[in-house]
Structure formats: C-alpha cells, structure tokens
UniProtKB/Swiss-Prot annotation:
Hydrolase is among the record's keywords: no
Lineage top rank: taxon: Eukaryota
Entry's localization field: Nucleus; Chromosome
Pfam families in the record: Protamine_P1
Statement: the UniProt record of this protein carries the keyword DNA-binding: yes
Protein name: Sperm protamine P1
Protein source organism: Monophyllus redmani
Keywords: Chromosome, Developmental protein, Differentiation, DNA condensation, DNA-binding, Nucleosome core, Nucleus, Spermatogenesis
Signal peptide: none
C-alpha cells in the first residue's frame, strides 16, 4: 500500500534504501521538486 512513500518519511534508512533502488533501476529521483521520490514507486513526483 505505502510502497511509494516519499523519502521525507520519518525513517531515513528506508528512504536511503529506496533512493539506492531508484538509482539501480536507472530511474531518476525527483530531487528538484523538493521531494526525493522514486518515480518507479510514485506514478508522478508528489510535490507537497
């Protein structure tokens, strides 16, 4: 359910793992939108 949680979540270790996975899958993370979410887990970078 919460598979596409943003990197701004309380658990930073999970955020780091997700970022690494994002890089491994060759998927760019939306770092310019103030949110570091993997586009693979989020249909579109959620800007909030």
């Amino acid at each position: 359910m919460a598979r596409y949680r943003c990197c701004r979540s309380p658990s930073r270790s999970r955020c780091r793992r997700r970022r690494r996975r994002c890089r491994r899958r060759r998927r760019r993370c939306c770092r310019r939108r103030r949110r570091v979410c993997c586009r693979r887990y989020t249909v579109r970078c959620r800007r909030r």
